[in-house]
Structure formats: C-alpha cells, structure tokens
Amino acid sequence: MAAPMTPAARPEDYEAALNAALADVPELARLLEIDPYLKPYAVDFQRRYKQFSQILKNIGENEGGIDKFSRGYESFGVHRCADGGLYCKEWAPGAEGVFLTGDFNGWNPFSYPYKKLDYGKWELYIPPKQNKSVLVPHGSKLKVVITSKSGEILYRISPWAKYVVREGDNVNYDWIHWDPEHSYEFKHSRPKKPRSLRIYESHVGISSHEGKVASYKHFTCNVLPRIKGLGYNCIQLMAIMEHAYYASFGYQITSFFAASSRYGTPEELQELVDTAHSMGIIVLLDVVHSHASKNSADGLNMFDGTDSCYFHSGPRGTHDLWDSRLFAYSSWEILRFLLSNIRWWLEEYRFDGFRFDGVTSMLYHHHGVGQGFSGDYSEYFGLQVDEDALTYLMLANHLVHTLCPDSITIAEDVSGMPALCSPISQGGGGFDYRLAMAIPDKWIQLLKEFKDEDWNMGDIVYTLTNRRYLEKCIAYAESHDQALVGDKSLAFWLMDAEMYTNMSVLTPFTPVIDRGIQLHKMIRLITHGLGGEGYLNFMGNEFGHPEWLDFPRKGNNESYHYARRQFHLTDDDLLRYKFLNNFDRDMNRLEERYGWLAAPQAYVSEKHEGNKIIAFERAGLLFIFNFHPSKSYTDYRVGTALPGKFKIVLDSDAAEYGGHQRLDHSTDFFSEAFEHNGRPYSLLVYIPSRVALILQNVDLPN
C-alpha cells in the first residue's frame, strides 16, 4: 500500500513536499481544490507528471518530437520506394540474423538478409526489377525469417504488417503485402465532437442475422442507417485489430496494424468510417494495448526468438487469467510501436478516438485480479501501481489530443482510479471519459437476487450518481460483457424463454413479458438520464435482443447461431421488439434536443422506498420513475426548482412503446409555490405503476 505524506509527520516537510509538487505540476492546485482528499498523494501526482514530462523531453531530444516518434509505421515494416524498390525495417534485438522471404523469391529463406543497425534494428533495401517494376507486387505473401541466437530458424509476420489473412483450413494467418495502386480517398470530413455522447457499441462480424461472419460492406449498408435512425452519434467498433481467434471477441490481438481481414479489405473499413462521418456519426476504435496474443507464428510473441522482445520477460510478461503477453511499457521501441499504432488508426482509417480496453490490468501490477476496490485512496497509489503503464496512457492521450483535439478517449477501468479522467496538466491520466462499470452489475444483481418490491431506490440512485466530480462517465445498462455466453442480456434476464413464444402482438401480454418490456424501458431511461455524461448501448440490446453471444468454437461445434444479431425482429410489425426499439430511438432524440448528458449532474429530489418512486431534474426536465410493480399514484406531489406549466415529452406507457396508455398527453401540469423535498415548487402528477415519465417546463426557453 502507499504511504501518503501526512501533516502529522513533520508539518514543515509536508508543506515543502506539497509546494514542490504544486510547482512541478502546472494545474495540480486545481485538482486538489476539486478533491482535497488527494492532498496526501500530491507527491505521487508530481512523480507521475515528471516521468511523463521527462519521456516527452527525451523523445524530443532523441527523435525530434512525438510527432516523428509516432510515425514508426512509415519506416518499419515493408514499403515501396519512389524508384520501385522496397525498404524493409524491423526491431529484433534478440535476433542473430533477419531475412525477408515470400512469393517473390520462391520462399528462399536467406537470399535477402537485413543489415544490422544500432539498438536492435535491422534494415533491407531491395532494388526494383530491371524494367523498374516492383519485385514484390501488391498481394504477395511475405515472411520475416529470424535466426535466433540458439540457432533456430523462425518464420514470422512483421509486427507492422498492414494486412493478414487466413486461407482455407490454415491454422495460422499469412502476411499479405498490401500496396494497392489506388488508396481509398475519404470524401467526408470528421464530424464535430458531439456535446453529448450516445455510443452504439458494435461488432462487424456479428452484425448480420445470418450464421456467418458479416462484412464491412454489410455493416456500412445495413447497420449504419439503423444506428443513425436510432439517434446514436457515435459508434464504438470492437474486434477490428486483427485477432487470430474469432471467439476472443477481438481481445487477443495478433497484428496491431492490420484491420481484420475476416470482414473485408482495409479500403472497405475506410469506407465504413467515411460513410459514418457522412451521417454525422463519429467512430471510436476499441484499442487493445493492455495485452497481446501468445501466438508466435502469426503474433508478436517471441518475434525475435526471445520472450522479452515486445513484452516483459519471465512471469511479469504473462497475464495468467487472460493467458496473454504483457507489454514492457518502459521500453523505447515498445513506446514507439504503441504510439505509432494509435496514430495509424487515427490517420489511416480516420477513427475519432479510442476506448482503451483493460486499463485496470495496465494500471496495477496485480492487474486487478482478486482485488475488491473499496475506494480507499491508498489503493490507487504506491508500489502496486505500474507507473510505466500509466505514463504510456498519459503519452497516448497527449498524442491523441495533440493530433486531433476533438478526439475522444475512454478508459475501461473498474478500479475507479482518481484523476484518470483529469487533464494531464493536473497530473491526471488525460482520458475524456471512463466507463461506469458498476451500473450494469447493479441491474443484473437486482434482477437475479431481488423481488421487484424489494428493490432499493436509494441504492439504485447511489450507483447511478456515484462518480467523481468533473470526471465524465459513460453510463450503460449493459454492454457486450453482459451478453456473453454464461450471462444474459437484460431482456433475457427479464423475459427468458417467454421471448421465444410470447412476443407476438397477436397474443395478450403475459405477466412476464409485460414486466420485462416495462422494466427494460425504465432501466435504460434512468441509466441514460442519471448515470453519466455519456451513454452506451451494445448492438441489438436497444430492442431487447434475445439470447446471449457465443462465437463459433469447439465447445459449440463451431456454431454461428449465437454469433449474430437478429435485426429483422424489430422490423416485424407483429412482434413486440419494435416497441423497445421505438423507445430507444425517442429517448436518444429527446436527449439530442435537451442535452441532459452534457448538463450538470441531476438533482435527485425523491427516492421513496415504500412508494418505489425516484424523481430528479436535469437539463430543465423533470424525470419521474415509478418502479412499484402494482401501485399507481393519483395526484402524487413531485418537487421542482422552477415554476411553470409542465407537459409530458416522453411516456414509457405510450402505445408505440408497448405501454398501457394510462396517461393523457394533452394534460397540463401546473406547479405551485409549495415546497417539497427541498424544492421551492411542486406539482401533482398521476404516476401509473412501472412507468417512466419526462416532463418539460414549457414556460422555460427550450
């Protein structure tokens, strides 16, 4: 555990250390003003900031700045020169020799040797043919041949490979030299950074209802219009970085610079991003820099014949739970590789930012395994923190926001590390948002362990509002994690097997389906309205996609049955899925109009345990939820900050959302100067059971 500096030790030492930290970190005073409880850890922020600044300075002195340093992909790998020749470069510090082989030389392993340079680098120039044509044409198969110090001959894919494919029944991927005559020309500029972030988490491969791997083209033509129609302004693309094992959900990366070929070509991914931009939708990449696949024949592992090339050697270089390799973030060339990878996806594919996967694993030497984070600040400082990894994340955020000031970075961190989403100038991590990972766990816990009448309103509100001041959160009721095999989506927890038999509008509501549809809407709206400064939905869950996600693997006889999204269910007018889809669409459109995600955190005026009522105000709107399974309330008094006439702008009980139409939308609700629940005004409202309402004060300017 950390040993914080405390005034009790020697007051003069404490003050001196605090003043030194404030002098070194430009805006640390602001961070400590926001959260005075961080004062004992000022020296930790000082050390982290100085380490970040020193590496940035070293990069400037030795590489000409981070701009040049992050362009590694322009020289490493294999490149066509202006004269038609080929320039090749690799970093393989443990190799005895490096060679290039492939179709072009009949797979002779040793006819094209690289020349050894300083610092473990190797380079090769191959002149063009006599007729000036390229010796290695577009589409050629290549391999780097490594001779190890122990005498082994190893066939490897360049870590900088831009395209790899697996042909037929081959176990391993092949490296394809991707050098098309014409590159994709982007037609549309990046959209402006949205004031409110409404994210549609997507996986290209499962985006079809057919039992197959869907394509970039399919996603562009069929899924993008749905996302636009639903009112989402951001797509988060999973499983794009190449991964040999499809069932890893894209989290065991083998080729970091290659867009997955199982969905199509690099140009087709570029077209997908470009088309999204034309719709005003920004696109984030789910980037995996927390670990890498153990594959060596088609991955980074043992690239130069040693276990310490890109990774820590020994036990520190392996994540036992994930069975994967862990980067040595203090290594100069690994920093070049990872920062260049960030830049590659920003510039080559025009992604608008990143969701960083596995940040908790990066931040701590214990990787978060077996750790129940209590929120005690000592858990976030001291020897358990991997400050090399934290410094890399600061560098990555610095690079992203320098290259594209409007870009967005999101941290997947379950630990709740303070200041992770504070500016680097304050000593923070520099992320724009963090995922509010406790929220989906709370909903699943309630559905699994509690009867509806035992739901604790205060507990729900606490989970939805428990976030650090001025560190923005992405709220979500469920993501891909909750849909994976072994778990269930919210809809399946609520309705289970009845989704197969009782979702037709031609049959009466059963109690299970009625409860499921009403609570599904309420859970999503209260998460959207109260839970954060951004909102995320995993594809298909907007309409209550049945079942779970399970990728083809030996354990399910390589079946694609659960690795698809049945969008046709919401297009069928005779099925009730359309009601949930309609509600999701109108919830997003209303947020676009009023911007509650960009507004200050809500004021919760009521969380009544007996009545099961939650009421709060945000962005000038009054949100009211009645979670009681059977009780409706006539003339229920709800507090409000400002006087005026109120009208219903969203009603989960409306017919188009599969509700029971118990509310008259022509009704006007007038406030009176009657103080209630700490609010100076209040109004009387009819609140049916299992209903969520949003009221607008029409006397206020919109």
UniProtKB/Swiss-Prot annotation:
Name of the featured protein: 1,4-alpha-glucan-branching enzyme
Pathway: Glycan biosynthesis; glycogen biosynthesis
GO BP of this protein: generation of precursor metabolites and energy; glycogen biosynthetic process; glycogen metabolic process; negative regulation of neuron apoptotic process
Pfam families: Alpha-amylase, Alpha-amylase_C, CBM_48
Recorded GO CC terms: cytoplasm; cytosol; extracellular exosome
EC number(s) given by UniProt: 2.4.1.18
Organism: Homo sapiens (Human)
Biological function: Glycogen-branching enzyme participates in the glycogen biosynthetic process along with glycogenin and glycogen synthase. Generates alpha-1,6-glucosidic branches from alpha-1,4-linked glucose chains, to increase solubility of the glycogen polymer.
Gene that encodes it: GBE1
